[in-house]
UniProtKB/Swiss-Prot annotation:
Signal peptide: none annotated. This is Probable phosphoserine phosphatase. Mg(2+) binds at D82, D84, D240. It is an enzyme of class 3 (hydrolase). Binds 1 Mg(2+) ion per subunit. It comes from Schizosaccharomyces pombe (strain 972 / ATCC 24843) (Fission yeast). Belongs to the HAD-like hydrolase superfamily. SerB family. InterPro entries: HAD-like_SerB, HAD-like_sf, HAD_sf, PSP. Its EC number is 3.1.3.3. One of its GO terms (cellular component) is cytoplasm. Pathway: Amino-acid biosynthesis; L-serine biosynthesis; L-serine from 3-phospho-D-glycerate: step 3/3. GO terms for biological process: L-serine biosynthetic process; L-serine metabolic process. Pfam families: Hydrolase. Keywords: Amino-acid biosynthesis, Hydrolase, Magnesium, Metal-binding, Serine biosynthesis.
Amino acid sequence: MVNAAIVVSSNRPNVLEQISSLFRDGKTRSLGEQWTLVSGQLKGTFEDAKDACNRISATENVDCNCLSEATFSTKKKLVVFDMDSTLIQQECIDELAAEAGIQKEVATITSLAMNGEIDFQESLRRRVSLLQGLSVDVINKVIGKITFTPGAKQLCHCLKQMGATLVVASGGFVPMAEYVKGQLDLDYAYANVLEFSDDGKFLTGKVQGAIVDGQRKASILREKREELGLNKLETMAVGDGANDLVMMAESGLGIAFKAKPKVQLLADSKINLPSLQNALYLLGIDEQQQKKLLENKN
């Protein structure tokens, strides 16, 4: 017997009928205006159900996520987020490049890295080298342009109310990550350290210390999990790029948010709707529960 929970961004009868057909005794529960939970004992294997959900996602243009009973029912006490194009709407290095007038060159390398076509460490060094001589004042300009992803503040607030420890682990840079940490009331921020000239006025085009790549993100999640005395099922990771997949695999629930196709196929779950707050539905937190959590300002 295999028990599972399927969470889908739809309440359309034809979609729910397809999902219900995967269960022996599926129970349906509305989570809100747009999300539905169907849970119970599957007729076939978990892998078959996941494949069916991927087909439903593609043919019905919905987010259909099949989660194991253990994954769905375990409270998430540690959540690690990617930053660029996940918590915020920018890719910070692209914004720095725009200030330097080299956005096309840097964006091309960024795209190759996020699609897993070139090594992230190599791509980061190549991109940062193009920023040599850029004034450090530009960093504050970029921070001033940061816009948060819809639902990011609400998701983080609700998770904090639920007692979770929140971490941003970014392949971007420390000043931006610290700003995001402060704005979203996160507990920890990890990112790459840009090297400055001796007078502190310009970027040298180099990164100091170990690069925060996919492996380092996974290590951060693992280290924090061990510090907190948690098991894998009590953790969650959210990201959009290929370099987030190792971190997602290290977590109990990996969520690909508006991610590249390869990432969506390999992650535990996916969200393609514009708001990050939708991640709460994958935890079984319905609309009314979310409203109560958001009303609590403590």
